[in-house]
Amino acid sequence: MGRFRGGLRCIKYLLLGFNLLFWLAGSAVIAFGLWFRFGGTIKDLSSEEKSPEYFYVGLYVLVGAGALMMAVGFFGCCGAMRESQCVLGSFFTCLLVIFAAEVTTGVFAFIGKDVAIRHVQSMYEEAYSDYVRDRGRGNGTLITFHSAFQCCGKESSEQVQPTCPKELPGHKNCIDKIETIISVKLQLIGIVGIGIAGLTIFGMIFSMVLCCAIRNSRDVI
């Protein structure tokens, strides 16, 4: 009986430690998602009328999952401390929802990467063509692109030189820069999503083991 209670206490503390880590991870995920959405390249592109909204879907899901992670982390601590099977069962269900959301984010980031790259490149191509035909059209859009991606023009920057960043050292092809930057950012989002999904698996295992241990301890009593 003493060993059983000791094992139950050990599982409970493991779950408490997991929930603390999960709460901190949720805070980090929210900060990460908001930084990606409202900072740097993405912030500049979002000001454009033709900015691809689907490009942000993965980030919105990531931020939402982060907020849910923080709430669930607190919820899980309460369930572990009270040794409540009902609360632990609800905690498991919430983790399952987070797992599905994070896997969706990761898969969306990896699968939708090429589509997002082509869409942003086509936006740049259109703004570039408008500016070449008429210097009054596409001017603001090109400046936004060149500033966000720190690039200038395509094969050459001569036709769009007035819209290029003054501090830019030499010529950098925007088509190539768009592909590189978006690819890296979406891969990072995908890795974070899959990583958090992997973390939730441990939480689900701990919660089910503790729930079963609590039920068995009550049966023994």
Swiss-Prot record:
Its main location: membrane. It comes from Rattus norvegicus. The chain crosses the membrane at residues 14-34, 55-75, 91-111, 189-209. SUPFAM superfamilies: Tetraspanin. It is found in: Membrane. This is Tetraspanin-2. Expression is restricted to the nervous system. Keywords: Glycoprotein, Membrane, Transmembrane, Transmembrane helix. May play a role in signalling in oligodendrocytes in the early stages of their terminal differentiation into myelin-forming glia and may also function in stabilizing the mature sheath. Residues 35-54, 112-188 are extracellular. It holds the Pfam family Tetraspanin. One of its GO terms (biological process) is astrocyte development. GO terms for cellular component: myelin sheath; nucleoplasm; plasma membrane. Belongs to the tetraspanin (TM4SF) family. It is a multi-pass membrane protein.
